[in-house]
Regions:
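Alpha-helical transmembrane segments in inner-membrane proteins
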Residues: 1-328
Length: 328
């Protein structure tokens, strides 16, 4: 019998945690559910379990995984352990697109929820502008990319504030609630489409893990080792933007997942993307789903949005990381 390698054991461990979260967290909430009532589909426990708890747990798992994997990609491309989708303004662009859709009352575009299309469009426009601003002699400067991303985030945030001041009270409440970032219940049709996008994108990215190991060292060196640097970079930005925009469209902007999880996983298991990517995906999902479970339990019957819980945990962690960097 073949023994599992240490790297395989890490992936298995995170996979078990992901599965356990999917099974246990739907039962965590402001009031308990009777397991026997759920098993026999008795109301109201069955409806609460299926329509509320399971859907938001699954959304938390896959949204957290998507944000964490996107953060891992951007950190590899920029060779900066603190890079996130927020760093490049992609999350802000997706947020602006979604807010515009809410403001204008768009429902569907070509049969697809308008907020999805608008978020993806906003992310794509910001990415194109940021990369274009940082492009010099067909090479992208990481420093210029970061500065362009910060500028784009500021501009998008300003436009969001302008729109917020123009909309009606009802829409302003919807926008402010959405901007907090949460994994409130979503219908299964939207959830199914989101999960499909995330799983397919994650599978494509993880198949390129070996090439990302080379890219994380140095793109020039990676090209001498046979990596198609330009193609890989474009696919990385595209995949990271798609994961971010798809998540923001359903959950609103949720910060720190794409920073905290890849950084923690990398410090514990190393920088081999063949292990880092799946573990970061699984770990990010567990973290965000757990934050949602905490938020709906600690001040019951009220709730704290998952984005707020994540910020409470992630903010001090970022300060600690920056302090460790300055000391070293």
């Amino acid at each position: 019998m073949t023994r599992a390698t240490p790297t395989a054991r890490w992936v298995l461990l995170f996979g078990v945690a992901f599965g356990a979260a999917a099974l246990v967290l739907p039962f965590v909430g402001p009031f308990g559910l009777n397991l026997e009532n759920v098993r026999t589909r008795q109301e109201p426990d069955w409806s609460i379990f299926v329509q509320l708890r399971v859907s938001r747990t699954l959304l938390g798992l896959f949204a957290g995984g998507a944000l964490s994997l996107a953060g891992t990609l951007f950190q590899a491309m920029l060779r900066d352990a603190l890079a996130t989708p927020y760093t490049l303004g992609i999350s802000a662009g997706a947020s602006l697109g979604a807010v515009v859709a809410i403001w204008l009352g768009w429902q569907q575009i070509a049969g697809v929820p308008a907020i999805w299309v608008a978020a993806l469009g906003g992310a794509a426009v910001v990415l194109a502008l940021v990369v274009g601003a940082a492009l010099h002699h067909r090479r992208v400067s990481s420093f210029s990319l970061l500065l362009s991303g910060l500028a784009a985030s500021s501009v998008c945030s300003a436009f969001i504030l302008v729109i917020y001041g123009l909309v009606s009270t009802t829409k302003s409440f919807s926008i402010s609630r959405w901007l907090i970032g949460s994994v409130d219940s979503v219908d299964y049709a939207a959830l199914g489409g989101f999960v499909l996008v995330v799983v397919v994108t994650a599978a494509v990215v993880m198949r390129q893990a070996k090439a990302w190991n080379l890219m994380a060292v140095d793109p020039s060196w990676a090209s001498t080792r046979g990596a198609r640097v330009t193609q890989l970079t474009l696919s990385g930005y595209g995949a990271g933007s798609l994961l971010t925009a798809a998540t923001v469209a359903l959950t609103g902007p949720i910060g720190f997942v794409g920073l905290v999880v890849p950084h923690l996983v990398r410090t514990r298991i190393g920088a081999d993307h063949r292990v880092l990517m799946p573990c970061a995906f699984l770990g990010g999902g567990v973290l965000l789903a757990a934050c949602d479970a905490i938020g709906r339990s600690v001040v019951a019957p009220s709730e704290i949005p998952a984005g707020a819980v994540m910020a409470i945990l992630g903010g001090p962690y970022l300060v600690w990381v920056l302090r460790q960097r300055s000391m070293s």
